[in-house]
Amino acid sequence: TFSEFNSNIITSAMFMTALAPNLVIVALAKTMKIHISWLGWFTASVVPCLLLFILVPFVIYKMYPPEIKETPNAREWADKSLREMGPMKVSEKIMAGVFILTIVLWMMSNTLGIEASFVAFLAISLLLIFGVLTTKDLLSETGAWNVLIWLSILVFMAGELSEMGLIKWLSKSIASGLHGMNWVAVLAILMVIYFYAHYLFASATAHVTALYAPFVGVAISAGAPAMLAAMLLAFCSAIMASTTHYANGPASILASSGYVKQGEWWRMSFVLGLLYLVVFLTVAPLWMKVIGMW
């Protein structure tokens, strides 16, 4: 249960399109003249996330060793299941092709000069044209409609607040408490505060909407490189799900399954939260420096 949950957290930090609040982050960053592309996000996250894919299962294994450590019949069971499923259907092949096309276009969006939203609408249109999806399928995706509707409102509000100077004022107010400190220390403190502030939120989108822009503004005003501050706090918006059993949707679902007691969930989350922070406070900035992102 915990390995599955933390795999979800790591992939949410790894891919821009893996988590709904990530799209909010990209939009908020754009209001601050910081452009984050799909490929740029992935390039910045790939090394720290791959490292976490190795470290996190190891820590979980040491803290809670599995009851079953050998599965000699796993391959036979998998082969049998594949035979029962049969060959890929035409609709499944079309879905795979559209998925690959979408990822390629997202990766090349800067080169081709196209927006990520255009690619998303293109993919949906192709799936509708070829009958892979129906309008009924689209209407039933209430979560996606919520993001689509509220994202535009939130982006508009963020832009207006920025124009009115509220974000700048809030950034200066927070920065006054960190006055005189090196930008490295300021950014580290902001990341820790941003991470643990999620104990007060049950929604990552609400957290991002409330705190992301002001915290990035404070970091930049302290002298931190804009892209570095934007990306580290973006990653923090994904890994902060490792705080509680109500931190995001998957946490609530998996915690309610009953496989992990609430006390064990909080204990494991605290330990892994420290690991996430260490990796994204050390490995991520160094890697982004190597690839020239700041």
Residue positions per predicted region:
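Generic alpha-helical transmembrane segments of integral inner-membrane proteins
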Residues: L50-V59, A96, I100, V104, ...
